[in-house]
Amino acid sequence: MTGIGNSHIAIKASPEVQAWFDQGLSLLHDFWDYESAKAFEQAVRLAPNCGMCWWGLSRAIEMREDEMSVYGKKALARAVELKSHAGAEGKLYIEAAAAAAAAKNDDRSAEIAILRTLVKKNPNDIEARIYLAGAVGNGYDDKGEPKPGQKERIAILESVIRDAPTDSAANHYWIHAMEPGNHPEAALKSAALLASLAPTSGHMVHMPGHIFYRVGNYAEAEHWFAASIEADERYMRDQHVSPDDDWNYVHNMMYAIANLMEQGKLAEANALSDHLSAARGKLSATLYIWSARDQVTRISQRLPVALRVGDWDAVLAMLSQANLGEGEKTANLRFLAAELSDYARGMKALESDDIAAVDIEAAQSASARMDAGLWRAQKAQEDKDAAKDKDKKDDAKTNDAQKDKPPMAAILPDANAEPLMKCLSIASLELRAGVLVAQGKLDEARKLYAEARVEEKKVGYHEPPFYIRPVGENEAAALLRAKDYAGAIAAYETALEERPNSGFGLYGLARVKELQGDAAGAREGYRAFLKAWPSADASLPQVAHARSVAGAEVAATR
């Protein structure tokens, strides 16, 4: 394969085996597990005693996670058996992988120690430094600042990019290292470069979109997400591969849909949602059962768009038409649909420009049903977790032959419950806070909104965000109805920190200025909104209203 990157580790093998190994390694760094495994398998066929080839195969299989874990362990065991033939550096790569596999409770200290030895032995080994960076990284704190291990990861990757500025893997990992923190703009240079280093890889072409989305350059992000769709569809068509073996395809489209929404391109977002619905696979990797956003699309493909804009009538219509069947395989999806129905009913009851006309009783009733459903689900999950713990203890007593049986991948598995409950708990807090605003209890409402924002942060960084509509926007809309203009401005600004340059937040700020009677501020705000949404759906009421207030000269530029 060509156009997949430029990674290399010198191994003790023939030139042909080396070429297959490097192909597998580049694909591994592209997160292209399916093709990476195929390349390493070919290397193993040609050189069955190549320990590093087995090492690579184990890494590729590991990336496919649980359903392939038995095979990954066998490949790693074979690498360990052959490590004495792998050379001094190859032996350390294999030992580091073995240490990682044997680690308990995410303790990577043994692996890190071996990788440090490898880097010390050969400071110019780019791959060793990249693997060390991956091992030491431990993410960001609640304020978006890097933890100590993450600081070291960043420093290592910076040094690698200084020494090898066009290394495809280093630029890929640099984007991942920087995007969750407070300074995603530090990866803009890599975002501009990466796709040219691996133009065949759908994921590598997609990655620039992560950074451009984070910095609020949604138009540029759209370009890369669209290019990734083309790359993946060309690959699947030419190689007769299904979406189940190209996980990036679904991931990229989910991100593309989220990105279109932030630009006000709702018609395109809906059209791409329809395309995605027909393109999903049948396994957990392409159904994204751990992503709350993806599970919403399994109920109804256009549901995330309706939730993003707060079109509660459309949300309720889609939920009422959902056909999720019966039985255990859709239990969590049915729970999600029921909870979203109560949430939408409550939010609809609260939505009125005249706060005195709000149907508080209906909103309270919906909130109570939602909370009762969450309580029952949490209790059921606790019971399931207890049963799983018992099963694990029983499994520990089974014989080795039983443990090594190849696992069967579930077809059309249910959604994971935990991410759903986290997001629904946030929605519950929002709904309860909205009721308090309608009752005039603003101080109590602010506390609940603050709690909801904390919980939104705790969900963690995801690509795209699991929580579809930022808490700040719902808070601002409620406070605006209560004529708490200062509170609404602060809430919209908080939302814009999460989604920079999003037209939803910018429109909200302009609307506050208008309701305050600040005509000049409103015109300026609506102009900023129209600048951010130059290609938004012309039929959107926000666009029409902004143009009417901002002036004819702004309308003429559209």
Where are these regions (language model features)?
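Alpha-helical segment of the N-proximal tetratricopeptide repeat
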Residues: 13-42, 94, 98-105, 430-431, ...
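"A position-specific structural signal for the A-helix of alpha-solenoid helical repeats
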Residues: 22, 56, 94-99, 131, ...
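Residue-level recognition of tetratricopeptide repeat
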Residues: 16, 49-51, 125-127, 166-168, ...
